[in-house]
Amino acid sequence: KVNLKNGPKVSNVMYGTFFGGDTAMKEFRNGFDGVFSTYIGYNGSHQVFNGNSLWQNGGTLGVTGTLYKGDWFGGWTIATGLSGVDANTMYGSENFGMWSIGTALKTGYNWELLNNKFIIQPHFIASYSLVDTFNYTNAAGLKIHSDPLSAVQLAPGLKFIGNLKDGWQPYLGVDFMWNIMDKTKFTAMDTSLPQLSVKPYIQYGIGVQKRWSERSTGYAQAMFRNIGRNGVIFSLGYRAAFGRGK
């Protein structure tokens, strides 16, 4: 659940899948290596609050560049998305569209201990998102207009990773998610509605990664959220390398 400032508690269920591809690792100057990636995904969600129900379905397209030097890494991604919303309210059914664009930077360091059997990874993510809803007329006949939602999120975190035999890597992680610029203005028939925003929250959980070879890895994890929002995220992933690239 998401506890909105100046608003209701929202029950939020999200789901989706992503597919992407990476280039071969490229060598740059001063000891840097890098890889470029593209990805496309489907995302859906269902929100319920105060007797209202919203279903969202859409897609995302993005690109990422990642640099490595020794135990340090840093990545930059940019993505855009388009979604359709089917809403059911006390006045009837409504349909409208949303679009978004966003970018994020992530950097971290792998501190290797006990002959690389244990890794402590401090990391930091900074992201910016711009989300806008197309103007529409709701089921009550009111014209709804909203300013674009402009959100910045800062997320420092810490990850503890174990290197076991046969390519197994169990890990624990914790992140603090802080939203510092996340208010938008809604108007209905030129009347301003209350501003809503998301409270900071903590995300923590466990996972495991399995490396079958240099070209094949998979993972499964469960992340829990508390304080500003409550819930759990389950995710699975698999990566395979093809061709002759490194």
What are these model-predicted stretches?
Residues L4, T23, N116-K117, T133, ...:
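Short linear motifs in intrinsically disordered/low-complexity regions
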Residues R29-D33, I125-S127, Y201-I206:
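Short, functional N-terminal and low-complexity linear motifs
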Residues I120, I125-T133:
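Solvent-exposed flexible segments
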Residues G62, T66, K143-K246:
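Outer membrane beta-barrel transmembrane domains
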Residues Y42, T80, A126-Y128, V174-W178:
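Short, small-residue-rich loop/turn micro-motifs
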Residues K1-I119, Q221-G228, I233, G237:
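Outer membrane beta-barrel translocator domains of Type V secretion systems
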Residues N6-N12, N50-N57, G84-G97, L130-V152, ...:
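Solvent-exposed, glycine/polar-rich loop segments of beta-barrel outer-membrane systems
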